[in-house]
């Protein structure tokens, strides 16, 4: 399998992990427990959070599409830097989750797994850059 194909697959696995991270946060709702983190009164109150989430989910989707159709050296350089950025963001998120009390260890385990996937994505993206 080519590094390009591995890159696409790793981005897809990463996105599935992100979705599961969100799903784990909402799972208590199905057991009658509250997951309320703020006392927002309307969608307008949480609009910035929604935009931030969209801004975090969409770039990997665009990267998957671009990687599927682009093989230029300049794109590969950009893509490698992009994977590094996401690894740094994942590491920061993992550290932030460790600061929340109580620590939700199943989320920490998932975030550590996502960080490992990100590191693998960095490595494969670097291989693709050098190919």
Predicted regions mapped to residue ranges:
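Hydrophobic transmembrane helix segments
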Residues: 14-57
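Cytosolic juxtamembrane helix and N-cap/initiation of the first transmembrane helix
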Residues: 1-18
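Membrane-water interface at the C-terminal end of transmembrane alpha helices
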Residues: 115-131
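Hydrophobic alpha-helical membrane segments
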Residues: 58, 76-95, 114-117
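Canonical alpha-helical transmembrane segments
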Residues: 55-72
